Amino acid sequence: MEEVPQKIDFAGEESKILKYWDDIKAFETSVKMSEGKPEYSFYDGPPFATGLPHYGHILAGTIKDTITRYAHQTGHHVERRFGWDCHGLPIEFEIDKLHGVRTKEDVLKMGIPTYNQHCRSIVMKYSHEWEIVVNRMGRWIDMKNNYKTMDTPFMESVWWVFQELFKKDLVYQGFKVMPYSIGCTTPLSNFEASSNYKDVSDPACVVSFQTLDDEKVSILAWTTTPWTLPSNLALTVNPKMEYIKINDIKRNQIFILGKNRTSILYKSDKEYTVLETMKGTDLIGKKYVPMFPYFASDANMGGFVVIGGDFVTDDSGTGIVHTAPAYGEDDFNVCIANGVISRDQFKRPILNSVDANGCFTSDVTDFAGMMVKDAETTKQISIYLKNKGRMVNSANLVHSYPYCWRSDTPLIYKAVGSWFVRVESIRDKLLANNDKTYWVPDFVKEKRFANWLKNATDWAVSRNRYWGTPIPLWISEDGEEVVVIGSIDELERLSGVRVTDLHRESIDHITIPSQKGKGTLRRIEDVFDCWFESGSMPYAQQHYPFENKDKFEKIFPAHFIAEGLDQTRGWFYTLLVLSTALFDKPPFQNLIVNGLVLAADGKKMSKRLKNYPDPMEVVSKVGADSLRLYLINSPVVRAETLKFQEKGVQDMIKDVFLPWFNAYRFFVQNCLRFEKATNTTFQPDIKVALASENVMDKWILASCQSLIAFVRAEMAAYRLYTVVPKLVRFIEDLTNWFVRLNRKRLKGSNGDADCLAALNILYEVLMTICIAMGPFTPFFTEYMYQNLKKALPKEKQMDSVHYVMFPEPIQEAFNTRIEEAISRMQVVIELGRAARDRRTKPIKFPLKEFMVITENQQYLADLESLKSYILEELNIQNIVLTSDEGSFVVVTAEADNKRLGARLKNDFKKISPLISKLTNEQLREFQKTQTIDILGHELTSEDLKIIRKYNGETTNSEPSGNEEILTVLDLTVDSALYEKGLARELINRVQRLRKKSGLTFDDPVSMFYHTKEAELKTAIENNNDYIKETILFNLQFSETTSPSNSFATEIVSIVKDNDAEIYFLKN
């Protein structure tokens, strides 16, 4: 092994590792090495390359990389292919902005070939930047052999998927009200529409509809979408609700509205008189005068009539709903049910009064060409209604309203002709297949996703757009003959034309002769919703079923996928719909859902606000490993939100990587020292490690096996949120406990044999944790491994730590008894440190006594066997271990009020005061049995928490404790203890200066100190042996200050006025 430098630049070392991986083709080699092993299939959800990767992408990528690296290290062959989403609105929207495209006419004027070529030119706009980020984060994935949704083989498989659904009668053409994006001039699926809500202020109007049979009577309706009033065809009441006819005293008008809805207009019932009370059924069939004249002739087709619908309630509005079937889902359904419209009336003008751009058509003469959601349009409609005497009341309402996820413009609901996949008919299968999958965290599957599936509606998969996979439907002019094409070969067979590209410009002109004498069949204009393409990814990335048929069928469904919580209604959903429709199987077996990464202020990360640091700038400062560990050691891996803090990433260096590095460096340093001192070569031998009788050796080795067993079990359950904290805690145990408590042994203070045993233990643990942490922190583990492996025989050395299989636990090294004992020792030491901190007694100053009180005899026996460590760590002279709780401890109980209140209801008030009166004897018995009866109610350890309090004086003592033990620190200080504290602080300053000067323990130097303080000089003389034993040098007193030939000198203040100068001279 080679010497390790004193300091490390983590980011700099990572850059060297990247070059090394590139040189040895590490990823490619690892995949090749694992050929023939059991397959572990993984699907990578395709991102768009039109935007730069952000922390959400980095998080998901890190989770994917960690799991797939672990799968490789546990003996699997893991194909990892990157994918790109290339089609759809995100691409088209960029082109529309770039070229000023607003309407369909603009596209046709430009020409679809030119428009699509523009789209193609930006699809991979940031692919290079993506590759840089993915590579820099240490993610191993094949970005060269990627899949793209715009590639012909992928698109051909999408055609096959659609044809299969058509064969199963799961495809139909319909007329349906859908969320519609004015900004992108296309309908959206329900899951797209639910992804971007904003609180907005909209007009809320009460308007009156004059009844046809009595011009003095008007029916009142309430709406927040006055732009839909020109398309009104019905008024809907609830047949079971009560309604009233009233005389408005101030307005001198007669209105009909819900009996319980008068508050929408009136503050007092003195403002009106009730003329008649009626049921909703009494109103059904009543006709009224159209509010606008544009579609008055629709009265002859069953329009402008009161109808019944159960969705009407009396908790808002007037209890009567203005119904425009073309612009509301409930409106559409209730009008269908009541025969006001039918599904085949695609071209009825009143159902098409708003064009594709969100503007009124020429039929709506007063507002033709006006954008329906513009404020000016609302104003003009309001003026019209007031002039006609139909505006009864108007106000503004703040409510949550859907916006287009891509153009960020308000959506409208609009009836459109579309091609649908039947989802409602396979809901039960979707739920059954969802039950076969395993999600982390489980609540997302059981609650959020399952609830979404229960209410899933038929999926509109067609988009009247241009850059996408064309829907392969060729239809006769009368719509009677429909041909669905499932492959390029089939298209050639039926049309006589062979194509190599499947985009619109390549196939729109192709016609198919009718086989039923209906002339020529032409392709419909629509393309697929891009979610249909990404949902087809398991099949299309393999060009299934045209290629890789056997391969696909062996690895489907995927073992693992991972994406963000937002994909619950996106990719996770479309994957499940298509796999269920095609094969009645779930598309994946295991899924990790990550939460959202927010800015430090809890707001969404925004380029405009610049409220987050650039990811690559963070990585350039502290390295990718720190960012990886920060992200996957946070609640975000269990679908919770993370407020990103750059300090949190930096803390990973301070709290994890630097201590880990220092432990590794300390090992190498002392290994090389041992080799030099013994003139031997260190060769790690697990037998030597296992033979060690040292309790700390047994503990760290046992802990290491427990860790490996735990990681294997939890990784099998995909619980990163339990695994990573455990790994980090182990590194703390290794660095802050094992290494620190065994420094002298590792330096050889107990002889060569003991030193060799300690070095073997430390090597074994460092190498094990190095391999185990490989999937999580791939750079630093590689850095360490490249040096640590040099101690191994050549045949056991691998080119990369990531080629080494994940460790198996060593069964004979397990020792839960020792693990428990050391854990108890740690608790006691931490309680003692906390007591020192509270009373401002630094650890450098010795204290007289420390008492531990517990009735648990095994606990005391464990501490007795380890008391030398406790004495040293707490810097105390004596430890007292006693089970005499009666003399020192007052025991009380504290109730879990929330738990007991919910369970005991009214009896809790009677029981609560009795809990506080329980005696020491009762509570000690409760501790043994874990149960106690109070007024007939059995209380357990989950209901009561035991509190131990010290009953002695606390002027010169400081108690601490938990549910098991109580500790008391004696704060009395005598002169001998005070002097030892001074000596200890001087040692600390000498060691710091030695480190600062770059000295090792073997360097030939002399150490001196000079002081005029008699108190300090006496303290040093009285503790000379202790000082020499610790620093391994004789610290000599000098009558004078440091001479000119001293190469390191420092004036230090030991305590208060006790100053000293320490310096080193070369021998």
From Swiss-Prot:
It is found in: Cytoplasm. GO terms for biological process: isoleucyl-tRNA aminoacylation. Coiled coil: none annotated. Keywords: Aminoacyl-tRNA synthetase, ATP-binding, Cytoplasm, Ligase, Nucleotide-binding, Protein biosynthesis. Its EC number is 6.1.1.5. ATP binds at residue 607. GO terms for cellular component: cytosol. It is an enzyme of class 6 (ligase). A motif ('KMSKS' region) lies at residues 604-608. Gene3D superfamilies: HUPs, Isoleucyl-tRNA Synthetase, Domain 1. GO terms for molecular function: aminoacyl-tRNA deacylase activity; ATP binding; isoleucine-tRNA ligase activity; tRNA binding. PROSITE patterns: AA_TRNA_LIGASE_I. CDD domains: Anticodon_Ia_Ile_ABEc, IleRS_core. A motif ('HIGH' region) lies at residues 47-57. Pfam families: Anticodon_1, DUF5915, tRNA-synt_1. The keyword Zinc does not apply. It catalyses: tRNA(Ile) + L-isoleucine + ATP = L-isoleucyl-tRNA(Ile) + AMP + diphosphate. It comes from the Eukaryota. The keyword Protein biosynthesis applies. Its main location: cytoplasm. PANTHER family: ISOLEUCINE--TRNA LIGASE, CYTOPLASMIC, SOLEUCYL-TRNA SYNTHETASE. NCBIfam families: ileS. Belongs to the class-I aminoacyl-tRNA synthetase family. This is Probable isoleucine--tRNA ligase, cytoplasmic. It comes from Dictyostelium discoideum (Social amoeba).
